[in-house]
């Protein structure tokens, strides 16, 4: 199969939405029957984002094969059917690590290791490998043109475009076309300078996607075309929208997909966007609204919970309600108590690491349990629910996780002592193990108890969800907790690890050790999120009634 490559760069400012624009183009091409994949090349030195602060970098998206990746891969999976893997995201740090490892082994036969050709060759090899087996591979380059960090990646894709030829490569550049209120017009100079910077390193964009808060007028498109040496039909206006799921239709209306397939000489049918039209219709026509309190510790940056936010919105589509997310700092719950949890239709406690704010999450679980308020716990959200139940129902005073209190008299949650590395080898984990890449990661099979809310939600007796954690329920306490009324409704494939818990006499008190948000999409939803929002809707109606 001959793979065509679309390289996506950004200029003027960061946070223009390269990932969303690239994913939207991928969605249109997929709707034309093409097999599309995507890649994100990140210029930072970290080997992967696994140990980066969520409040700086946003969430870590976990793929089926257990790679800890950039949150843009979450956008990719929400827009196209192709599942991402560890080949779809790599960093400068990963490239340098692999090149230096080869140098230490003597693979370069004593050569002087340089950015060109050794680093650029390594980048090109990964890009080509990631695109194998697909009709089109869309490659997003992180950062902004002009950044020092991005230069090796830009040089690599410049070389690739020469090697692949025009029939197999295309450059799409996102820029900002700001509107100046004082002048009463949009300004194209930032775009012109950004393209000039890109051309100075040997890359001439074939498509310009112009971001702004309003459409770019036709006369300004003509001006951009003239000064940036890009066909006028390839100057695409992409204004701000109230829903990112409208973007595929906006790009298609301007003929971007047709331009791409003609450039690549691909014969394929017109794009069928009826699934996206349905998503947009459901989003625009809710029959009600529910308020979900998300009790977390990274709420100053909502992108730290990007997939959770999106999964709640998707669940709203399937329940025909809009979901209003109220972000609640778990430390505020510790300081002010239950008053900050009033007026909610459901509580969701997402994942997290470290002791800060844990008691606030435990209090949130207690409030939901005692007030029959729908509760959904994810990863740490399961652990705090279990700790709360152990303390206040099972009579295990002082129960805790050894992550937060190594001297707890009742360690109901403890460290997983074995883990499998990327090569598939079993290694021992202990308190001083490296933080990076030493968790239980990726898709795992879970057996569900018959008749449980979990089994009803999934409409079956198994599910496969993605994990990212070091700590698990301590099996030594299972019998005592079960006798107190807790149901262990999900177990690992070998039935040795607890994957899900729930309370049978509660409208919806369900928690999973995994991260179901990573498998939610606007077209398909996710069973547990759909069930949770349905329970929140029912709670609201009962409360109002």
Curated annotation (Swiss-Prot):
Gene: pyrG
Positions that bind CTP: 14, 147-149, 187-192, 223
Pfam family, one: CTP_synth_N
Keywords of the record: ATP-binding, Glutamine amidotransferase, Ligase, Magnesium, Metal-binding, Nucleotide-binding, Pyrimidine biosynthesis
Protein name: CTP synthase
Binding site for L-glutamine: 352, 380-383, 403, 470
Binding residues annotated for UTP, in chain numbering: 14, 187-192, 223
An example Gene Ontology biological process: pyrimidine nucleobase biosynthetic process
Binding residue positions for Mg(2+): 72, 140
Cellular component, GO annotation: cytosol
Reactions that this protein is recorded to catalyse: UTP + L-glutamine + ATP + H2O = CTP + L-glutamate + ADP + phosphate + 2 H(+); L-glutamine + H2O = L-glutamate + NH4(+); UTP + NH4(+) + ATP = CTP + ADP + phosphate + 2 H(+)
Enzyme class: ligase
Gene3D superfamilies with a match to the protein in the record: 3.40.50.880, P-loop containing nucleotide triphosphate hydrolases
UniProt: ATP binding residues: 15-20, 72, 239-241
Other remarks on this protein: CTPSs have evolved a hybrid strategy for distinguishing between UTP and CTP. The overlapping regions of the product feedback inhibitory and substrate sites recognize a common feature in both compounds, the triphosphate moiety. To differentiate isosteric substrate and product pyrimidine rings, an additional pocket far from the expected kinase/ligase catalytic site, specifically recognizes the cytosine and ribose portions of the product inhibitor.
Active site residues according to the UniProt entry: 379, 515, 517
Entries under CDD domains matching the protein: CTPS_N, GATase1_CTP_Synthase
Subunit structure: Homotetramer.
Function field: Catalyzes the ATP-dependent amination of UTP to CTP with either L-glutamine or ammonia as the source of nitrogen. Regulates intracellular CTP levels through interactions with the four ribonucleotide triphosphates.
Regulation acting on activity, per entry: Allosterically activated by GTP, when glutamine is the substrate; GTP has no effect on the reaction when ammonia is the substrate. The allosteric effector GTP functions by stabilizing the protein conformation that binds the tetrahedral intermediate(s) formed during glutamine hydrolysis. Inhibited by the product CTP, via allosteric rather than competitive inhibition.
Protein's pathway: Pyrimidine metabolism; CTP biosynthesis via de novo pathway; CTP from UDP: step 2/2
Domain Glutamine amidotransferase type-1: 291-542
PROSITE patterns the record matches: GATASE_TYPE_1
Keyword Nucleotide-binding part of the UniProt annotation: yes
GO MF annotation, one: glutaminase activity
Region entry Amidoligase domain, spans: 1-266
């Amino acid at each position: 199969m001959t793979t065509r490559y679309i390289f996506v760069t950004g200029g003027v400012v960061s946070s223009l939405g390269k990932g969303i624009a690239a994913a939207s183009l991928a969605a249109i091409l997929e709707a034309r029957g093409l097999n599309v994949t995507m890649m994100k090349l990140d210029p930072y030195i970290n080997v992967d984002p696994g140990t980066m602060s969520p409040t700086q970098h946003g969430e870590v998206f976990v793929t089926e094969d257990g790679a800890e990746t950039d949150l843009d891969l979450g956008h990719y999976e929400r827009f196209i059917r192709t599942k991402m893997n560890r080949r779809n995201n790599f960093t400068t740090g990963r490239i340098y690590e692999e090149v230096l490892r080869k140098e230490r082994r003597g693979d370069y036969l004593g050569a002087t290791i340089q950015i060109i050709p050794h680093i650029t060759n390594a980048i090109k090899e990964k890009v080509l490998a990631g695109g194998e087996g697909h009709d089109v591979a869309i490659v997003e380059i992180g950062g902004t043109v002009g950044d020092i960090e991005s230069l090796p990646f830009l040089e690599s894709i410049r070389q690739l475009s020469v090697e692949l030829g025009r029939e197999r490569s295309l450059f799409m550049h996102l820029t900002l076309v700001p509107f100046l209120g004082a002048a009463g017009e949009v300004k194209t100079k930032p775009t012109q300078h950004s393209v000039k910077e890109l051309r100075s390193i040997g890359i001439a964009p074939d498509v310009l996607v112009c971001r702004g808060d309003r459409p770019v007028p036709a006369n300004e498109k003509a001006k951009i075309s003239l000064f940036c040496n890009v066909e006028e039909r390839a100057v695409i206006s992409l204004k701000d929208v109230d829903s990112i799921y409208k973007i595929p239709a906006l790009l298609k209306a301007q003929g971007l997909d047709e331009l791409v397939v003609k450039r690549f000489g691909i014969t394929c049918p017109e794009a069928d966007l009826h699934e996206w039209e349905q998503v947009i219709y459901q989003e625009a026509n809710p029959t009600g609204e529910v308020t979900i309190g998300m009790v977390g510790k990274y709420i100053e940056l909502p992108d730290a919970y990007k997939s959770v936010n999106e999964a709640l919105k998707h669940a709203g589509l399937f329940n025909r309600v809009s979901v209003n997310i109220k972000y609640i700092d778990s430390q505020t719950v510790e300081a002010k108590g239950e008053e900050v949890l009033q007026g909610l239709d459901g509580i969701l406690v997402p994942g997290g690491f470290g002791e800060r704010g844990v008691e606030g999450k435990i209090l949130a679980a207690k409030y939901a349990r005692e007030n029959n308020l729908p509760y959904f716990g994810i990863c740490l959200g399961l652990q705090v629910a279990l700790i709360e139940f152990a303390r206040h129902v099972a009579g295990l005073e002082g129960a805790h996780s050894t992550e937060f209190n190594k001297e707890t008299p009742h360690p109901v949650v403890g460290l997983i002592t074995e883990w499998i590395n990327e090569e598939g080898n079993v290694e021992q984990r202990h308190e001083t193990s490296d933080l990076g890449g030493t968790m239980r990661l990726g898709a795992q099979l879970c057996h569900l108890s018959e008749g449980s809310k979990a089994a009803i939600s999934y409409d079956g007796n198994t599910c496969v969800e993605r994990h990212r954690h070091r700590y698990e329920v301590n099996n030594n306490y299972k019998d005592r907790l079960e006798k107190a009324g807790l149901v262990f409704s999900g177990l690992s494939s070998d039935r040795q690890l607890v994957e899900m818990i729930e309370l049978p006499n509660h409208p919806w008190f369900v928690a999973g050790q995994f991260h179901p948000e990573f498998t939610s999409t606007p077209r398909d939803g996710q069973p547990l999120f759909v069930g949770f929002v349905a329970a929140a809707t029912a709670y609201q109606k009962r409360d109002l009634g």
